Amino acid sequence: EAIKMDVRQKRNKVLGERVVKALESRNMDAYYAETKEEAVKKALEWIPEGSTINMGGASSVHECGLIDAIKSGNYNFCDRDKASTPEEKQEIARAAFSCDWFLGSVNAMSEDGVFINIDGNANRVAAYAFGPKNVLLIVGMNKVVKTQEDAMSRARNEAAPVNAQRFGIDTPCSKAGSCFDCKSPECICCQILVTRFSRQKGRFKIILVDENLGF
């Protein structure tokens, strides 16, 4: 078992470092972390104290421990979970467009550094595309696939059904486990964003992590 893990770590490191170079060629900053702890350390090196931070719904950011570190540090964290009304939640989501740092992940990423994100409300993909000064993404190596076509398939047939189940949403994919290209009223695949380049150099900062994170 230890040998199997060691071989997998070697494979992920070689692949991860190649993906880092691919992301850098797309005008983004990228880093490969072998552990969640290393990922959090790197993220906090990037984010200056006193920064205003917002986020989309991203399990990966919670799972690696970054949110706990930010909440216990000297940052202005806009926490949607503390909103007491739907209106307040919307207000916090809209504040993302003027924040210093927006945190999130991806639904899938190809080995050549293109990533796919699918949203229902679209607050996350909107902020990735425009607004926040910096976008920091935590991406487990479980989300890296060979091609852009594979990335789209992973986003729609793996990530979306799991997220629909996670939120208790009544869609065909939540019942059957894969995408039916539905037009259900509760569809969470309303907006699909393909990110292939950053016009603003270094606006995207991506930490690849040798862990299974998110969905």
Where are these regions (language model features)?
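Short, Lys/Arg-enriched N-terminal segments with co-localized hydrophobic residues
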Residues: 1-4
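N-terminal glycine-rich FAD/FM-binding segment characteristic of electron-transfer flavoproteins
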Residues: 8
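Conserved phosphate- and dinucleotide-binding cores of soluble alpha/beta proteins
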Residues: 97-215
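N-terminal active-site beta-alpha-beta segment that forms phosphate/nucleotide-binding
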Residues: 12-93, 97-103
